[in-house]
Amino acid sequence: MPPAYISTMSKLSKNYLNKINKILNKILEEEDKKITECAKLIRDSYKKGGQLYIFGTGHSRLLGEEAFHRAGGFAAACPIRDDNLTFKKGAKKATSLERTPNIAKKALSKYKITNNDILMIVSNSGVNHAPVEAAMIAKQKKIK
């Protein structure tokens, strides 16, 4: 590679990392209290025998998969798995289904989630039907 190309890539990499660090610092400043509160809820639930369930659709479900069964990770993490909310049957189908009423209810009903557990809901937009419905179900059942 020509030296000019490497120099440009180096500048782009540094610029990218600087922007990421700014975003992470902003999150730390603005959300630290909330993150700490959530961590305490998860810890307290775990101490009482509770589990951390993670619900998401599309790419958002990957956080649950990532947390599940990791060496050295949190053993009580359980992803909510439902093939209808993955891309297994195609992106168009999954996108359509995540906007279908009762889809979250159907997915959550496969698990014995109690008000001693934590339900983490992951959503890119926060507006699709499935994650909103999951939050409403959690609120109704007094699940944190």
Task: Go through the PLM ranges and name each one.
Residues 1-8:
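N-terminal amphipathic/basic-hydrophobic helices that include classical n-h-c signal peptides
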Residues 8-30:
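Generic N-terminal amphipathic, Lys/Arg-enriched alpha-helix
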Residues 47-144:
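Glycine-rich phosphate-binding loops that contact phosphosugars or nucleotide phosphates
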Residues 24-34, 119-128:
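Short, glycine-rich nucleotide/cofactor-binding loops
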Residues 21, 25-28, 43, 47, ...:
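Short amphipathic alpha-helical segments enriched in leucine
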Residues 30-47, 107:
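A short, well-structured juxtamembrane/interface segment
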Residues 12, 27-30, 34, 59, ...:
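Catalytic cores of large soluble enzymes that bind and process phosphate-bearing ligands
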